[in-house]
Amino acid sequence: MKISANFLLNNCARTYTKKKTLKKCKRELVEVVDGLVGVMMTSSNREKPDIESGYDGSSDEDSTENSRAEICPSALCFFDQIVASAQDKKVVLFLDYDGTLSPIVNDPEKAFMSSEMRATVKSVAKHFPTAIVSGRSRDKVFDFVKLTEIYYAGSHGMDILASFADSDSTIEKTKETKLFQPANEFLTMITEVSKSLIEVTKAIKGATVENNKFCVSVHYRNVDKKNWKLVAQVVNNVLKDFPSLKVSTGRKVLEVRPMINWDKGKAVEFLLRSLELDDSETVLPIYIGDDKTDEDAFKVLRERKNGCGILVSQVPKKSEAFFMLRGPSEVVILPVMLNFFAALLIMPS
């Protein structure tokens, strides 16, 4: 275990000079770290089944023979490295939604985030610019998250809404909204292909089609395994009439998207530029995600040579990310730790 109260105490000790304040910080830090260690030990077990939401607790990811540490070390155990990288830098936090902020569930309409996770994201956004980058439509993600303090990029980054707030918290914040939709010309086509996919999958029990505005998701999580190939066949048959669209795979989902040079990595770069936070020397972007599409963002951060990609996965796998977390139960811990550390750094001495 590399997370230690002493590490955090030494860092905050450099910031505070008042004996009373430092003593209080030490006490709070010990309590927080002790609590986090307990949560980490609990979260090391497999997720418990959630009957109401339809989550069965099992992983649908491919396992490998390698241990987790041989592929990506735990972001919690190596939190000191993350904080060391963030010293004297502006942290920007990017988060996937499904499988990261919420559990993967059988019914996509029931992928609710916990109240604890929502409160954590809301709190961390007070200290760091925070964005959610999801394959879902932007409106649908907002309906799940319900936070106005953060930025949203839906449709795998093809629908970005950035609201820039005044930094003076003592006055009412005024916002300048920037909407970016690089696949806008495909909107009518996506609507058409969505209708076609709904029609051809009607006969396949368990298959569902989700129109995410600039992309379409065909979910086969509830389809009998013997019919998975059939799902792929009907999707490919429909796409024969739409040569400018492509299909990619996710976690028991087929994603139909425009064939343009845009992905979650491009969305991250766009948001960093829009926020005027694209200086790799002074900014540390952190991206947390669980899906194959998040690898594009991990790759961008790796190529910047000053970013931190964190893969969410219950099983070890090769990734462009630097660290791993094992599910939403661990994801919720990292922002808490970042948030607490940031709060200490900005307290007056």
UniProtKB/Swiss-Prot annotation:
CDD domains: HAD_TPP (cd01627). Its EC number is 3.1.3.12. Gene3D superfamilies: HAD superfamily/HAD-like (3.40.50.1000), Trehalose-6-phosphate phosphatase related protein, domain 2 (3.30.70.1020). Its cofactor is a divalent metal cation. Belongs to the trehalose phosphatase family. One of its GO terms (molecular function) is trehalose-phosphatase activity. It comes from Oryza sativa subsp. japonica. It comes from the Eukaryota. Keywords: Hydrolase, Stress response. Pathway: Glycan biosynthesis; trehalose biosynthesis. One of its GO terms (biological process) is trehalose biosynthetic process. This is Probable trehalose-phosphate phosphatase 5. Removes the phosphate from trehalose 6-phosphate to produce free trehalose. Trehalose accumulation in plant may improve abiotic stress tolerance. Coiled coil: none annotated. It catalyses: alpha,alpha-trehalose 6-phosphate + H2O = alpha,alpha-trehalose + phosphate. InterPro entries: HAD-like_sf, HAD-SF_hydro_IIB, HAD_sf, OTSB-like, Trehalose_PPase.
